[in-house]
Amino acid sequence: EEDRFNKIKHFNPDSSPIPSISFVKQCAYHYFILKKFKNINFDCVFISTYDRNNDQWEQEIINNILEQVTCKKWVFNKMHHEHHAVCGFYFSKFNEALILVSDGGGEVIPSFNKTKQPYQTMESICFIDNKLKIFYKAASNYRGGIEDKKNDYKFKINETDILLTSKAISGLKYLNYTQEAGFGNHQEGQLMGLAAYKNKNTSISKSLLNIANKAQEETLEEKINLIKKAKKYSDCKNIILTGGYHLNCSNNFKLVKQFPELNFFVDPIPYDGGTAVGVALYEHYKK
């Protein structure tokens, strides 16, 4: 949310493609938004992350933030998809719900496979009533490239079904199509909009329209299958959609039409800003 205060659209202090430079920039950045709270002594500051898979880096970034606020204590964890889920559940006002999180990244799931790129969670199925239960997570190491490619692997961590894959799935798949179409970060909405022109009389190139259509259709089918999977875990009729992928209002609408028997709610903050709400609520209510 920093860009709302420093007036730099899509601002990201760690946007450099070189990880070491990204890290240095984020550790040195002074947040405009935190200046608004300089005279407040918070009872607790809760910190969320998409998981950089480097605890030392995470800690130094946290230290930079803590130098800019006053608080009695602070809490940090890497439950990225759970924070998305809790945020969506809070705004839904449901008493119970199945939450589907679809994202371009998230917390790392450890693997016995030695890979250059860790497996980052891309999809989750959770259930919340008065407790949070995680039924399923799918994680991908696709960003590691061909040398990192492994066969799909399924197993359990406690009660959670885990899928590890080297395929591009969920928000990562959509991001890949966005880049293939020549768009940059945060321009997924441009691709979504183009898909509506697939069979129209337009000067937009057919190749571009085909990419946009593939992105919409393939990921829609993926989400339909994820909802079907969720229904096998619980007969709850309340479904919450969250995670950055569900900024895709066009496919959200199609999902609602596909399953008229279900009660849908789309998280109003499905992008990563919502995890700040989610972590605070999770830590406050988990007792």
Identify the role of each PLM range.
Residues 1-287:
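Short acidic/glycine-rich loops and adjacent helix/strand connectors
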